[in-house]
Amino acid sequence: MKTKVIVVIGPTAVGKTALGIDLAQRYNGEIISGDSQQVYRKLDIGTAKASPEEQAAAVHHLIDVRDVTEGYSAYEFVAEAKALIADIKSRGKLPIIVGGTGLYIQSLLEGYHLGGLVDQEQVLAYRAELDCLSDEDLETMAEQAGLMVEGNSRRRIIRGLELKKFGENLENTESGYEPLYICLTDDRQVLYDRINQRVDKMMAAGLLDEVSWLYQEHPEAQAAMGIGYKEFFPYLEGQISLEEAIDNVKQNSRRFAKRQLTWFRNRMAVDFYQVSEEAVKDRIYTAVEEFLDD
């Protein structure tokens, strides 16, 4: 029997953290963060990490599990999340994944199992490389590789290219999980306004001090490349004004939100929920309860 997993996804600033806590409290669950930046200690504000009060309201995993000097990959996330899901289930609780890093979540929950003769990190690195390509470039690669993909589905093309590259060492089997994807969204302008307001709140909460520490201590770290940090480095070097740096954070965050929505829409079988819609919480509760009772 497959393990049922609730997955709360969506663009930045849409309200994933609050919903995840609500569902964990309501359905006896524990939260696994599906965010590539929230693993880092001391990076709290720019990563929009759940506050100490929020983390006290529900058990959270994969937050503050790496120093900023360490790297973090999809392979590490998959290995650690699998162990956590098994542990949470063994204690009679519901695993709830909350986050916006689509590659990590898809790598965990889609039907890929890596055989013992291939480096798992190598496969995930190749997947990330393919994901950076446009639909047109992927289709060209598929044609050159002699792949016949029904409907030219992006997901199927990537899967086919992986199988072509790694052959029998990559087993194409069903996942051991049964996920319910809850993808939060909102009208674009409303979402963009929320993003802008959140950046302003981050600045008021001390984001610049957090960035300054990172810039002084670990400017070359993988963590420093995240949105909300890298945009301030030119300001700290005297190249742009603080206002320009803040505007760049807002602009990059809006662009990232758009890319996230495109990812979830095109590459994962998700149900969308408009957060500003009346009674949206009731719709989500109904979906979760029907999923758990099935």
Swiss-Prot record:
EC number of this enzyme: 2.5.1.75
Region (Interaction with substrate tRNA): 35-38
Catalytic activity: adenosine(37) in tRNA + dimethylallyl diphosphate = N(6)-dimethylallyladenosine(37) in tRNA + diphosphate
Residue positions binding substrate: 12-17
GO molecular function terms listed in the Swiss-Prot or TrEMBL record: ATP binding; tRNA dimethylallyltransferase activity
Keywords from the named record: ATP-binding, Magnesium, Nucleotide-binding, Transferase, tRNA processing
Gene3D superfamilies: P-loop containing nucleotide triphosphate hydrolases
UniProt-annotated site: Interaction with substrate tRNA, residues: 101, 127
Gene Ontology biological-process annotations: tRNA modification
Annotated ATP binding sites: 10-17
tRNA processing in keyword set: yes
Top-level division of the source organism's lineage: Bacteria
Cofactor dependence: Mg(2+)
EC class of the enzyme, as a word: transferase
Purpose: Catalyzes the transfer of a dimethylallyl group onto the adenine at position 37 in tRNAs that read codons beginning with uridine, leading to the formation of N6-(dimethylallyl)adenosine (i(6)A).
UniProt similarity note: Belongs to the IPP transferase family.
Subunit structure as annotated in this protein's UniProt entry: Monomer.
Protein name: tRNA dimethylallyltransferase
Organism (species): Streptococcus suis (strain 05ZYH33)
